[in-house]
Amino acid sequence: MIDFGNFYAQIAHGPLSKWLEVLPAQLAAWQRDSLHGYFRDWNNAVERLPALTPHRLDLLHGVCAGAETPLSEGQRIGIEKMLRTLMPWRKGPFELYGIQIDTEWRSDWKWQRILPHLSPLAGRTILDVGCGSGYHLWRMVGAGAHLAVGIDPMQLFLCQFEAVRKLLGGDSRAHLLPLGIEQLPALAAFDTVFSMGVLYHRRSPLDHLYQLKNQLVSGGELLLETLVIEGDEQQALIPGERYAQMRNVYFIPSAAMLIRWLEKCGFCDVRLVDQCPTSVEEQRRTDWMTSESLADFLDPADVRKTLEGYPAPLRAAFIARKP
Protein backbone atom coordinates (compact mmCIF):
# COMPACT_ATOMS: atom_id res chain seq x y z
CA MET A 1 0.00 0.00 0.00
CA ILE A 2 0.99 3.63 -0.39
CA ASP A 3 2.76 5.07 2.65
CA PHE A 4 2.06 8.77 3.15
CA GLY A 5 4.14 9.00 6.33
CA ASN A 6 7.01 10.85 4.67
CA PHE A 7 4.62 13.54 3.49
CA TYR A 8 3.10 13.92 6.94
CA ALA A 9 6.58 14.37 8.40
CA GLN A 10 7.51 16.92 5.75
CA ILE A 11 4.56 19.19 6.47
CA ALA A 12 4.44 18.74 10.26
CA HIS A 13 6.36 21.91 11.10
CA GLY A 14 5.47 24.20 8.22
CA PRO A 15 2.52 26.17 6.84
CA LEU A 16 0.71 22.96 5.83
CA SER A 17 0.73 21.49 9.37
CA LYS A 18 -2.96 22.39 9.86
CA TRP A 19 -3.75 19.82 7.18
CA LEU A 20 -2.66 17.04 9.52
CA GLU A 21 -5.79 17.63 11.61
CA VAL A 22 -7.82 15.82 8.92
CA LEU A 23 -5.52 14.33 6.28
CA PRO A 24 -4.29 11.11 7.95
CA ALA A 25 -7.85 10.06 8.80
CA GLN A 26 -9.01 10.84 5.25
CA LEU A 27 -6.29 8.76 3.64
CA ALA A 28 -6.71 5.91 6.13
CA ALA A 29 -10.43 5.81 5.27
CA TRP A 30 -9.55 5.88 1.56
CA GLN A 31 -7.19 2.91 1.89
CA ARG A 32 -9.76 1.03 3.99
CA ASP A 33 -12.96 1.73 2.07
CA SER A 34 -12.38 3.19 -1.38
CA LEU A 35 -9.72 1.25 -3.26
CA HIS A 36 -10.38 0.65 -6.95
CA GLY A 37 -10.89 -2.96 -7.97
CA TYR A 38 -7.61 -2.94 -9.90
CA PHE A 39 -5.64 -0.97 -7.32
CA ARG A 40 -3.81 -3.98 -5.90
CA ASP A 41 -2.69 -4.98 -9.41
CA TRP A 42 -1.46 -1.45 -10.12
CA ASN A 43 0.27 -1.18 -6.76
CA ASN A 44 1.88 -4.58 -7.28
CA ALA A 45 3.37 -3.30 -10.54
CA VAL A 46 4.84 -0.33 -8.66
CA GLU A 47 6.27 -2.58 -5.96
CA ARG A 48 7.91 -4.82 -8.56
CA LEU A 49 9.79 -1.90 -10.09
CA PRO A 50 13.41 -1.53 -8.97
CA ALA A 51 14.22 1.46 -6.78
CA LEU A 52 16.72 3.24 -9.00
CA THR A 53 18.84 6.30 -8.29
CA PRO A 54 19.44 8.17 -11.54
CA HIS A 55 22.95 9.25 -12.45
CA ARG A 56 21.41 11.79 -14.83
CA LEU A 57 18.22 13.59 -13.79
CA ASP A 58 16.71 16.44 -15.81
CA LEU A 59 13.44 17.91 -14.55
CA LEU A 60 14.09 21.33 -16.05
CA HIS A 61 13.73 20.38 -19.71
CA GLY A 62 11.50 17.32 -19.26
CA VAL A 63 11.14 14.36 -16.92
CA CYS A 64 14.25 12.43 -17.86
CA ALA A 65 16.35 9.99 -15.87
CA GLY A 66 19.31 7.87 -16.89
CA ALA A 67 21.82 5.50 -15.34
CA GLU A 68 25.61 5.82 -15.44
CA THR A 69 25.71 2.35 -16.96
CA PRO A 70 22.84 1.59 -19.36
CA LEU A 71 20.34 -0.98 -18.14
CA SER A 72 20.60 -4.46 -19.56
CA GLU A 73 18.02 -5.41 -22.15
CA GLY A 74 16.38 -7.69 -19.60
CA GLN A 75 16.17 -4.93 -17.00
CA ARG A 76 14.71 -2.48 -19.50
CA ILE A 77 12.12 -4.98 -20.72
CA GLY A 78 11.13 -5.81 -17.14
CA ILE A 79 10.67 -2.16 -16.18
CA GLU A 80 8.73 -1.38 -19.34
CA LYS A 81 6.43 -4.35 -18.72
CA MET A 82 5.54 -3.02 -15.26
CA LEU A 83 5.00 0.50 -16.61
CA ARG A 84 2.72 -0.83 -19.34
CA THR A 85 0.64 -2.53 -16.65
CA LEU A 86 -0.29 1.04 -15.64
CA MET A 87 -1.69 2.03 -19.05
CA PRO A 88 -3.29 4.21 -20.25
CA TRP A 89 -0.70 6.94 -19.74
CA ARG A 90 -2.37 10.28 -20.50
CA LYS A 91 -0.06 13.04 -19.20
CA GLY A 92 3.65 13.14 -19.94
CA PRO A 93 5.98 12.35 -21.71
CA PHE A 94 8.60 10.59 -19.60
CA GLU A 95 12.06 9.38 -20.57
CA LEU A 96 13.19 6.83 -18.00
CA TYR A 97 16.41 4.85 -18.51
CA GLY A 98 15.92 4.61 -22.25
CA ILE A 99 12.19 3.89 -22.00
CA GLN A 100 10.11 6.51 -23.80
CA ILE A 101 6.59 6.82 -22.35
CA ASP A 102 4.81 8.57 -25.20
CA THR A 103 1.66 9.75 -23.46
CA GLU A 104 -1.64 10.82 -25.01
CA TRP A 105 -0.98 14.47 -24.14
CA ARG A 106 2.19 16.42 -24.87
CA SER A 107 1.96 18.04 -21.45
CA ASP A 108 5.42 19.52 -22.00
CA TRP A 109 3.93 21.78 -24.68
CA LYS A 110 1.45 23.21 -22.19
CA TRP A 111 4.27 23.76 -19.70
CA GLN A 112 6.30 25.64 -22.31
CA ARG A 113 3.32 27.90 -22.97
CA ILE A 114 2.56 28.80 -19.36
CA LEU A 115 5.98 28.83 -17.67
CA PRO A 116 7.13 32.22 -19.03
CA HIS A 117 4.07 33.89 -17.49
CA LEU A 118 4.39 32.46 -13.98
CA SER A 119 6.05 34.15 -11.06
CA PRO A 120 9.30 32.26 -10.35
CA LEU A 121 8.52 28.92 -8.70
CA ALA A 122 11.84 28.69 -6.85
CA GLY A 123 11.27 28.07 -3.14
CA ARG A 124 7.49 27.96 -3.49
CA THR A 125 4.98 25.56 -1.98
CA ILE A 126 2.65 24.57 -4.81
CA LEU A 127 -0.69 22.79 -5.19
CA ASP A 128 -1.70 21.19 -8.50
CA VAL A 129 -5.42 20.35 -8.56
CA GLY A 130 -6.38 17.47 -10.86
CA CYS A 131 -2.71 16.71 -11.48
CA GLY A 132 -3.15 13.43 -13.38
CA SER A 133 0.02 11.33 -13.38
CA GLY A 134 1.94 14.18 -11.77
CA TYR A 135 3.98 15.14 -14.83
CA HIS A 136 3.72 18.85 -14.08
CA LEU A 137 4.65 18.27 -10.42
CA TRP A 138 8.07 17.11 -11.59
CA ARG A 139 8.38 20.12 -13.89
CA MET A 140 7.56 22.38 -10.92
CA VAL A 141 10.32 20.68 -8.95
CA GLY A 142 12.63 21.22 -11.91
CA ALA A 143 11.75 24.92 -11.79
CA GLY A 144 12.91 25.06 -8.17
CA ALA A 145 9.74 24.46 -6.14
CA HIS A 146 10.33 23.72 -2.46
CA LEU A 147 7.34 21.33 -2.40
CA ALA A 148 4.86 20.39 -5.13
CA VAL A 149 1.66 18.69 -3.95
CA GLY A 150 -0.78 17.21 -6.43
CA ILE A 151 -4.31 16.02 -5.75
CA ASP A 152 -6.31 13.75 -8.02
CA PRO A 153 -8.89 11.12 -7.01
CA MET A 154 -8.04 8.81 -9.94
CA GLN A 155 -6.13 5.96 -8.36
CA LEU A 156 -4.35 4.85 -11.53
CA PHE A 157 -2.70 8.29 -11.62
CA LEU A 158 -1.44 7.79 -8.07
CA CYS A 159 0.21 4.52 -9.06
CA GLN A 160 1.72 6.07 -12.19
CA PHE A 161 3.14 8.87 -10.06
CA GLU A 162 4.59 6.46 -7.50
CA ALA A 163 6.12 4.38 -10.30
CA VAL A 164 7.87 7.42 -11.74
CA ARG A 165 8.95 8.57 -8.28
CA LYS A 166 10.52 5.16 -7.60
CA LEU A 167 12.51 5.42 -10.82
CA LEU A 168 13.59 8.96 -9.92
CA GLY A 169 15.26 7.81 -6.72
CA GLY A 170 12.31 8.30 -4.36
CA ASP A 171 12.37 12.09 -4.76
CA SER A 172 10.33 13.64 -1.92
CA ARG A 173 9.96 17.14 -3.35
CA ALA A 174 6.71 16.08 -5.04
CA HIS A 175 3.73 14.18 -3.64
CA LEU A 176 0.37 13.06 -5.02
CA LEU A 177 -2.66 12.52 -2.78
CA PRO A 178 -5.81 10.69 -3.96
CA LEU A 179 -8.20 13.50 -3.04
CA GLY A 180 -10.54 15.96 -4.70
CA ILE A 181 -10.30 19.64 -3.87
CA GLU A 182 -13.63 19.51 -2.04
CA GLN A 183 -11.90 17.31 0.56
CA LEU A 184 -9.30 19.96 1.42
CA PRO A 185 -9.81 22.38 4.31
CA ALA A 186 -9.21 26.05 3.54
CA LEU A 187 -5.46 25.92 4.11
CA ALA A 188 -4.45 29.35 2.76
CA ALA A 189 -0.91 27.96 2.66
CA PHE A 190 0.16 27.57 -0.99
CA ASP A 191 2.19 30.19 -2.82
CA THR A 192 0.98 28.99 -6.23
CA VAL A 193 -2.08 26.93 -7.13
CA PHE A 194 -2.59 25.28 -10.52
CA SER A 195 -5.93 24.10 -11.91
CA MET A 196 -5.50 22.79 -15.44
CA GLY A 197 -8.23 20.97 -17.33
CA VAL A 198 -10.59 20.82 -14.36
CA LEU A 199 -13.00 23.78 -14.41
CA TYR A 200 -15.22 22.53 -17.25
CA HIS A 201 -15.77 19.28 -15.35
CA ARG A 202 -17.23 21.12 -12.33
CA ARG A 203 -20.99 21.49 -11.95
CA SER A 204 -20.41 24.73 -10.05
CA PRO A 205 -17.42 26.53 -11.58
CA LEU A 206 -17.59 29.51 -9.22
CA ASP A 207 -17.42 27.19 -6.23
CA HIS A 208 -14.28 25.68 -7.77
CA LEU A 209 -12.71 29.12 -8.09
CA TYR A 210 -13.48 29.87 -4.44
CA GLN A 211 -11.96 26.51 -3.45
CA LEU A 212 -8.77 27.40 -5.31
CA LYS A 213 -8.67 30.82 -3.68
CA ASN A 214 -9.05 29.23 -0.24
CA GLN A 215 -5.80 27.31 -0.73
CA LEU A 216 -3.68 30.37 -1.57
CA VAL A 217 -1.72 32.57 0.78
CA SER A 218 -2.48 36.27 0.57
CA GLY A 219 -0.68 37.47 -2.53
CA GLY A 220 -0.51 33.93 -3.90
CA GLU A 221 -0.84 33.17 -7.60
CA LEU A 222 -3.41 31.06 -9.45
CA LEU A 223 -2.74 29.49 -12.84
CA LEU A 224 -6.08 28.44 -14.31
CA GLU A 225 -6.15 26.57 -17.62
CA THR A 226 -9.43 25.44 -19.13
CA LEU A 227 -11.58 25.18 -22.24
CA VAL A 228 -13.06 28.42 -23.54
CA ILE A 229 -15.14 29.55 -26.50
CA GLU A 230 -14.83 32.63 -28.67
CA GLY A 231 -17.17 35.40 -27.56
CA ASP A 232 -17.77 38.36 -25.30
CA GLU A 233 -18.21 38.49 -21.53
CA GLN A 234 -21.86 37.45 -21.80
CA GLN A 235 -21.23 34.13 -23.57
CA ALA A 236 -20.73 30.57 -22.38
CA LEU A 237 -21.40 27.16 -23.88
CA ILE A 238 -23.47 24.70 -21.86
CA PRO A 239 -23.12 21.45 -23.83
CA GLY A 240 -25.74 18.75 -24.01
CA GLU A 241 -25.03 15.18 -22.97
CA ARG A 242 -21.54 15.16 -24.49
CA TYR A 243 -18.81 17.53 -25.61
CA ALA A 244 -16.04 15.92 -27.71
CA GLN A 245 -17.49 12.62 -26.43
CA MET A 246 -16.93 13.66 -22.79
CA ARG A 247 -20.05 13.31 -20.65
CA ASN A 248 -18.98 15.47 -17.72
CA VAL A 249 -18.55 18.89 -19.34
CA TYR A 250 -20.81 21.53 -17.81
CA PHE A 251 -19.70 25.09 -18.61
CA ILE A 252 -17.29 26.44 -21.23
CA PRO A 253 -17.19 30.23 -20.89
CA SER A 254 -15.59 32.78 -23.17
CA ALA A 255 -12.24 34.06 -21.95
CA ALA A 256 -13.87 37.42 -21.21
CA MET A 257 -16.58 35.79 -19.09
CA LEU A 258 -14.04 33.73 -17.18
CA ILE A 259 -12.10 36.87 -16.33
CA ARG A 260 -15.34 38.27 -14.89
CA TRP A 261 -15.87 35.05 -12.89
CA LEU A 262 -12.38 35.30 -11.40
CA GLU A 263 -12.91 38.93 -10.47
CA LYS A 264 -16.33 38.17 -8.98
CA CYS A 265 -14.68 35.52 -6.78
CA GLY A 266 -12.29 38.13 -5.43
CA PHE A 267 -9.17 37.56 -7.50
CA CYS A 268 -7.20 40.55 -8.73
CA ASP A 269 -4.63 41.23 -11.46
CA VAL A 270 -6.46 38.76 -13.70
CA ARG A 271 -4.98 38.30 -17.15
CA LEU A 272 -5.27 35.94 -20.09
CA VAL A 273 -1.75 34.72 -20.88
CA ASP A 274 -2.30 32.07 -23.54
CA GLN A 275 -5.05 30.84 -25.83
CA CYS A 276 -4.71 28.21 -28.55
CA PRO A 277 -6.71 25.41 -30.20
CA THR A 278 -5.89 21.88 -29.09
CA SER A 279 -4.20 20.11 -31.98
CA VAL A 280 -4.21 16.43 -32.88
CA GLU A 281 -0.44 16.57 -32.46
CA GLU A 282 -0.77 17.65 -28.83
CA GLN A 283 -3.49 15.11 -27.91
CA ARG A 284 -3.41 11.83 -29.77
CA ARG A 285 -3.48 8.06 -29.59
CA THR A 286 -0.11 6.45 -28.85
CA ASP A 287 1.40 3.09 -28.04
CA TRP A 288 0.93 3.98 -24.35
CA MET A 289 -2.70 5.16 -24.73
CA THR A 290 -4.35 3.04 -27.38
CA SER A 291 -8.01 4.06 -27.13
CA GLU A 292 -9.74 6.96 -28.89
CA SER A 293 -8.28 10.45 -28.69
CA LEU A 294 -8.95 13.93 -30.06
CA ALA A 295 -8.93 13.02 -33.77
CA ASP A 296 -11.80 10.61 -33.09
CA PHE A 297 -13.85 13.33 -31.34
CA LEU A 298 -13.79 15.92 -34.14
CA ASP A 299 -16.14 16.14 -37.12
CA PRO A 300 -14.25 14.48 -39.99
CA ALA A 301 -15.96 16.87 -42.43
CA ASP A 302 -14.97 19.97 -40.43
CA VAL A 303 -12.30 19.63 -37.75
CA ARG A 304 -13.23 23.06 -36.42
CA LYS A 305 -16.19 21.29 -34.79
CA THR A 306 -16.66 18.37 -32.41
CA LEU A 307 -18.73 15.35 -33.41
CA GLU A 308 -21.64 17.01 -31.60
CA GLY A 309 -21.33 20.19 -33.66
CA TYR A 310 -19.78 22.38 -30.96
CA PRO A 311 -16.63 24.48 -31.48
CA ALA A 312 -13.51 22.29 -31.32
CA PRO A 313 -11.45 22.51 -28.11
CA LEU A 314 -9.88 25.90 -27.50
CA ARG A 315 -7.77 26.14 -24.36
CA ALA A 316 -6.84 29.28 -22.47
CA ALA A 317 -4.58 29.98 -19.50
CA PHE A 318 -5.17 32.75 -16.98
CA ILE A 319 -3.10 34.11 -14.13
CA ALA A 320 -4.76 35.76 -11.14
CA ARG A 321 -3.72 36.81 -7.66
CA LYS A 322 -5.38 36.49 -4.28
CA PRO A 323 -5.34 39.89 -2.54
Swiss-Prot record:
CDD domains for this protein: AdoMet_MTases (cd02440)
Entry binding sites for carboxy-S-adenosyl-L-methionine: 91, 105, 110, 130, 181-182, 196, 200, 315
Any matching Pfam family: Methyltransf_9
Top-level enzyme category: transferase
InterPro entries in the record: CmoB (IPR010017), Mo5U34_MeTrfas-like (IPR027555), SAM-dependent_MTases_sf (IPR029063)
One GO BP annotation of this record: tRNA wobble uridine modification
PANTHER family named in the record: METHYLTRANSFERASE (PTHR43464), TRNA U34 CARBOXYMETHYLTRANSFERASE (PTHR43464:SF95)
Assembly description: Homotetramer.
Family as reported in the entry's similarity comment: Belongs to the class I-like SAM-binding methyltransferase superfamily. CmoB family.
Biological role: Catalyzes carboxymethyl transfer from carboxy-S-adenosyl-L-methionine (Cx-SAM) to 5-hydroxyuridine (ho5U) to form 5-carboxymethoxyuridine (cmo5U) at position 34 in tRNAs.
Protein name, entry field: tRNA U34 carboxymethyltransferase
Organism field: Edwardsiella ictaluri (strain 93-146)
